[in-house]
Amino acid sequence: IAYRMSDMLNHYLPRPCGRILEIGSGTGFLTRRLMETLHPEKLVLNDICQEMSSCFTDLLGSGQATFLAGDAESLPFPKGQDLIVSCSALQWFVSPELFFERCNTLLKQKGYFAFTTFGRDNLKEVASVTGSGLHYRSLEELEEALRIHYEIVKAHEERICLTFGTPLEVLYHLKHTGVAAVRQQALSLIHISEPTR
C-alpha cells in the first residue's frame, strides 16, 4: 500500500516537496519512499507510539526530520505544510471528518492531503469471529467529507485480498502490519480458529 501511495504522490506532486507531515509513520516504510521520491526539505513525523522514533534516528540526527509522538487528532502540528500524508492510519481515528478539516488549516494554499485507509470489508472474517471491529467509512462517505475542504484530485477504491494457510499466519500478518482492528479484546488462536457454522 505504501508503494502505491508513494507512486501516486510521485506522479502528482512537484519535487522537491518542501515540507511534509506524515501521520502514523510507524516503522517508516512510507517515510523512506517519500525521502527517495519527493526529497522533502523538512519532514515532521507523527506516530501514536513514542517508541517508533527509534526507526528514524538517522533522519532525526540530521535535523531533516522531527518526530512528534501522540494522538494525531489532538496533537498540535506546524502549519505551512506542502503535503500531509497518512498511510493506513485514519481508520483508527474517532472523527476523520474533523481531522480532514484540521489538516486543511495546516496546509499551504496549494498543498496536498493524501491518505490511504481501509474499507468496509477489511478484516471482516476476523470481525465475524470476534464480534468486534472498527467502523470503516465507504469511499462515498470519505469523498463527501473531503469535498467540503478540498478539491479531490484522485480517489479510488481497490480490493486487495490476502489469503493465509493457517490462523497463525493471520496473526503474524496482523502483528507486523499494525492493522489488527479488534477493540479491547485480545486476539488469540482460539478466536480465529473457531469454526463458523
Task: Specify the residue positions occupied by each region the protein language model found.
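Conserved catalytic/acceptor-binding region of the Class I
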Residues: 108-169, 177-188
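A short glycine-rich, Lys/Arg-flanked "PGG" loop and its adjoining helix->strand segment in the class I
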Residues: 97-112
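A short acidic, Gly/Pro-enriched loop at the edge of an enzyme's catalytic core
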Residues: 73-84
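A short SAM/SAH-binding and catalytic strip from SAM-dependent methyltransferases
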Residues: 83-96
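Class I SAM-dependent methyltransferase SAM/SAH-binding core
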Residues: 19-75
